[in-house]
Amino acid sequence: MDYQKISRKLEILADAAKYDVSCSSSGNDGQGLGNSSRAGICHSFTEDGRCVSLLKILLTNHCIYDCAYCTSRRSNDIPRAAFTVDEVVDLTMSFYRRNYIEGLFLSSGIFKNADYTMERLVRIAKKLREEHRFNGYIHLKTIPKASAEILHEAGLYADRLSVNMEIPTVSGLKLLAPEKNHSDMTQPMAFVRNEIVSFADSRKTIKSTPKFVPAGQSTQFIIGAAGETDRQIIRAAGGFYRHYGLKRVYYSGYVPVLEDKRLPPLSTQVPLRRENRLYQADWLMRFYGFSDHEILDEQQPFLDLDFDPKLAWALRHREWFPVPLQHAPLEMILRVPGIGVKSARKIVQVRRFRMITMAHLRKMGVALNRARYFITLPEPNRYADLIDSPQLRGLLLQNTRSKFSQSDAVQSDLFG
């Protein structure tokens, strides 16, 4: 193996992969015993909260498409490189044996055609699994327009598949990527969803049925490139969760890197708070029982940057409050600002045996600086009397501190 040549390819293709936010760079130099190169190493988190290190690279940054927002676009004058199948396999196993990584995150520009590219991604995963007995995590990008046969094989070797929508609206995609259309991305999503269901049904009767994409599928939206409102983005995400059974939707604030009249100017920075608020709204849909239609409406198309989405929703719908915690159903307790999923379940358990008090809530981890205005308890709660007060918003602003409190907060460089 020509290590100097491989190192140069790794530098180019790891840098090209950094704009996919399905996992984040650790930025760790790893000095000392077992020192590793930081190029291509990123951290991601499993559903149970474990942090795993992944080799995150592109197979190639050559691409037949000329999407305005993409640094690998066909017309962009940048250094190009491409790994061979064996180079990616050897690189992955080399990092894995040294405990630098626990898995592989592999994407690619599209060269020649979709099947040609996807077939090589699958060959890498297959070779790792069958020839090298690689048991680590594998995340493959689904290439739009790839055949069903290749996608089926990909699902047998990858833990997760993802096809990035990038632009959440049809009009935005047509503006910035006229060579693509939404159905190119949704068709493979639908196929993977159906295969997941089919394999799960088969496993109920035939235990030897292999797993198909056990970690599910995901997608990513670029925020701020095409001028969509937060309402449009959230409703698009909600639709993908409902129709395609996605495990996650990721949101990436657009980082201006290319000069194009269709894009925001290079001096534009997407506020970090907007990206953060979208993740919080996504959390409400996934864990708190909110529908995408109710988080925002036509009168309120953007998320409130001063308050998290649940608190902002509560302020707009004060008729739902205060909530009597001693008797309210779990679904309503989950809508109280400052009460998380674990705390809500503890409240339901504890109230069967005793009267809930502020002291109990504090021990459960409830954020009382927000929750106290939206609840009633068996004991007196003078804060609940302020639910209809015009001053409530100001009081909450005084009591709420955010790490994004500076108005000029911008997105940090992923690899800076």
Briefly describe each language-model feature range.
Residues 303-332, 358-416:
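C-terminal extensions
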Residues 267-270, 284-323:
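Alpha-helical ds-nucleic-acid-binding substructure associated with the helix-hairpin-helix region
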Residues 73-88, 96-121, 127-148, 155-204, ...:
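Core AdoMet radical
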Residues 61-73:
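Local cysteine-cluster metal-coordination motifs and their immediate loop/turn environment
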Residues 169, 184-261, 270-296:
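Conserved C-terminal portion of the radical SAM core fold
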Residues 1-62, 367, 375-376, 383-405, ...:
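Flexible, acidic/Gly-rich N-terminal and inter-domain linker regions that tether
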Residues 118-126, 130, 155-164, 224-243, ...:
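Short, electropositive alpha-helical surface patch
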